[in-house]
């Protein structure tokens, strides 16, 4: 239903408002319109609204069902809803208090992404930013002019009031940092919300159950992740930083709020029925998968999904390796990961190492093997924990001669600041797993040199300009960032900054992930392996004596009266 070029029309304010509402109306399916009408009628017809039937702010907020812990977010979103409901006049005309049916239509179209069916070109981020922070003037009653003095050529972007809005300088408008963190936290909590399966309260109950935690801990975990995202911006957030956050750092984080407003399309009877359904268990791929873990819970999954949606479905993940369970050794790592024939994601967390590690002899050895980057910025964020990840698009393998991976691989940082380092097209040093000396695994570096044949001295290793390295004992790690020219692009936040993050590893995990075809193949393989393992563990107790006699005859085990033979 895109807009076509047409001869300009002269319309009144009332006609313009009705025209936009009609275009919004056409973006919804009949069943969705039925749900919206049902919610509107059920709300306003059971209250004393007088002659003017409009939904109040309190009734609107109640339909959304935002938890009381997020009152600041509720205030932001209801303020935004009022601003968007006044489109296309926004802040150029006062609006009437409350919400009409057409107002709800407009709000849903903007937040759900359906605006792409109405606009040829559109910049939603400026409109969202301003709508969250700027209040419309409210009048007891608003009458739109019926004089046809507005020119409209079919393109809303060139319509006078809209054009005026986008030309307005909003550089003085700032998103208070604490409120921005609250907003991000709620988006992370809301990740995975499906309005067809019940209310926000049901969603939170489900997440708490699946994470084996409590509401307070869930909110705290999500707030910690939100702070990591917010550190990509400095101070209070202006429009430039808001764009950076939602264009580059977390481009998919706003999706949950669209689903929140889609709640208005589901009848209260449907929501009540779904809320009474039992919480569905979360089933990661493979019966031996573990969830949640030290590194993977709802907050982490939501944070990864904010920049890479296909990492956000736990049911498409399989535990391949967990350092705390399987042991911090390359052999254990290899045993867990090398059989997986689809993409995977590695997560590693650790504690930052100081420049002077006299108390950690092995840390000094690591420093000698991987020299520090001169001129690197000393972190001043006050955080001690770091968390990195790496997405590998091919199976793991040993790499004594050549590296593996492709430009689809990428390094990412989750803490203390969210950052992404995408794979470059031409370079080839995307990943290596090295068993012989000096050993270890790295992403973005060439295969290292071995110890000198005659001197027995370990030469300092060369790492890629943007690279992540773990030593052979999976005890220490290093993230190196020295600009362009490597297998991975520089930071999206600080591309020109020299960084050398060194850390003592606390946890390492690898999770298998893939598309539907990969996963179906892997499901069959896993089921076969589990059946075989179960079969091998099964002993036919009725044939123990017969089996033992056969093994004695074959010389595999010794009989009670049997003497040893001679060479």
Swiss-Prot record:
**Main location, first listed in the record:** cytoplasm
User: What InterPro entries does the record tag this protein with?
Assistant: TLDc_dom
Instruction: Give the GO biological process terms.
Output: response to oxidative stress
Q: Which Pfam families match?
A: TLD
Keywords on this record? Cytoplasm
Q: Which GO terms describe its cellular component?
A: cytoplasm; nucleus
Domain annotation TLDc: ranges = 294-514
Location of the protein in the cell:
Cytoplasm
The job of this chain, per UniProt, is described as: May be involved in a process influencing telomere capping.
Q: What is this protein called?
A: Restriction of telomere capping protein 5
Question: Could you tell me which species this protein originates from?
Answer: Yarrowia lipolytica (strain CLIB 122 / E 150)
Q: Which gene encodes it?
A: RTC5
